[in-house]
Regions:
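Helicase motor core with emphasis on the C-terminal RecA-like subdomain
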Residues: 45, 53-58, 63-66, 73-82, ...
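Noncatalytic nucleic-acid binding interfaces
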Residues: 105
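Helicase-associated low-complexity/disordered flanking segments
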Residues: 1-81, 199
């Protein structure tokens, strides 16, 4: 049986731009929202204007979305926060703005290399330091097995980036040596260096009740709260995937102290979800139907984007390879490019597939669950989960 989650063309997936504020506000109004202890009203007009100037300078937006100022203010006051918002609602800005506004550093723990690559590439494409092209410097970096710059970690611990992304494995690496380096960075007496917050992105991975439970995530709270220096740094947990008991488990596991909890509905009314019984001929019969539908579509000027973007998930790496190869051959005459992605492939192959999908050079990506968490691509129209 296969499950298809489709986003029809007439209903765009919410982007991370200010254009979706109206839809966001509508969803928030009908959701059950936890009213935070701090409200944006506690910000003086001067403070709010200053934060909005930072927002406009770095991202080009004029105003914050509902709830963002409350979370940012909480973190600037060195208080923990838990953000349970749907995908595309602007969670990332809640930890990006404090770092850019204060000139301090945000450490972000993220579960996947592909997710970190995506966020860092977009940040460095929009936000930078330096006056001209010759002295332009990246604002963000990720530390992990996919990092090609051998000096990236040295530059990070020297305070050359404002947003440092790492995996939970990196956080615990070297018997605590990386944490100690972050601690040294936090206590530097330079006036601007130091950590303003630690963000735990996709924090549902913390919970044993979560669908993506990851043991290394479970250690984050103990690692941070038992560290002599980092225990004072505010933590913000963010996820779009957490039922109430998972939310409670996240807060408990991370040892959050009186956090500002901000919720909204996770319902995405622009998605169509359908379940189809696998045909007698197996998944190849289902794929043939899919290929026939693609071939019937009108070809625009850019044939490679005729089907917009599709992700097909398979349960095993071998099936990923088989399905990707079959689709590539079946769609060869259409100009629709297909690539595969799974953890057994080399870093360069995965990076190439990831970038090509984000830039539209590849229309269909066949992958295991190693791909997809947090991927921000607004023209993704179809997600297929195949169950063999």
């Amino acid at each position: 049986m296969s499950k298809k989650i489709q986003n029809p063309y007439k209903k765009r997936i919410l982007s991370t731009t200010a254009n979706s504020n109206q839809s966001f506000a509508k969803r928030q109004a009908i959701s059950q929202t936890t009213v935070p202890s701090f409200s944006s009203n506690e910000l003086s007009s001067t403070e709010q204007e200053s934060l909005e100037q930072t927002l406009n300078k770095h991202f080009g937006f004029q105003t914050f979305r509902p709830g963002q100022l409350s979370i940012i203010q909480t973190l600037l006051k060195k208080r923990d926060a838990a953000v349970f918002w749907s995908t595309g609602s602007g969670k990332s800005l809640c930890y990006q703005i404090p770092a850019l506004h204060t000139g301090k550093i945000a450490l972000i723990v993220s579960p996947l290399i592909s997710l970190m690559e995506d966020q860092v590439a977009k940040l460095n494409g929009v936000v930078s330091t330096g006056g001209g092209n010759e002295d332009k410097k990246d604002i963000a970096v990720f530390l992990g097995t996919g990092q090609k710059d051998q000096f990236a970690e040295r530059k990070a611990v020297n305070g050359e980036y404002k947003l440092i992304y790492c995996t939970p494995e990196k956080l615990a690496s070297g018997g605590g040596s990386f944490l100690n380096q972050m601690g040294n960075l936090h206590t530097r007496n330079t006036g601007v260096d130091g950590l303003c917050l630690i963000a735990v992105d996709e924090s549902h991975c913390v919970s044993e009740w979560g669908h993506d439970f990851r043991p290394q995530y479970r250690q984050i709270g103990d690692l941070l709260r038992n560290h002599n220096v980092l225990k004072t740094v505010p933590i913000v947990a963010l996820t779009a995937t957490a039922v109430p008991r998972v939310q409670t488990d996240i807060i408990s596991s991370l040892h959050m102290r009186n956090p500002n909890i901000v919720k909204q509905s996770f319902d995405r009314d622009n998605l169509i979800i359908s379940v189809k019984r696998k045909p007698a001929g197996g998944y190849r019969s289902a794929l043939k139907t899919f290929v026939d539908e693609v071939k019937k579509m009108k070809v625009p000027a850019n044939a490679a984007r005729r089907h917009s973007s599709t992700i097909i998930y398979c349960p095993t790496q071998s099936q990923v390879e088989e399905v990707a190869e079959w689709l590539s051959m079946a769609l060869e005459s259409t100009g629709v490019r297909v690539q595969s992605y799974h953890g057994g492939q080399g870093i360069e192959h995965r990076s190439d597939a990831h970038i090509n999908f984000l830039t539209g050079k590849t229309s269909i990506i066949v992958a295991t669950l190693a791909f997809g968490m947090g991927i921000d691509k607004v023209d993704t129209r179809l997600v297929v989960h195949g169950i063999e």
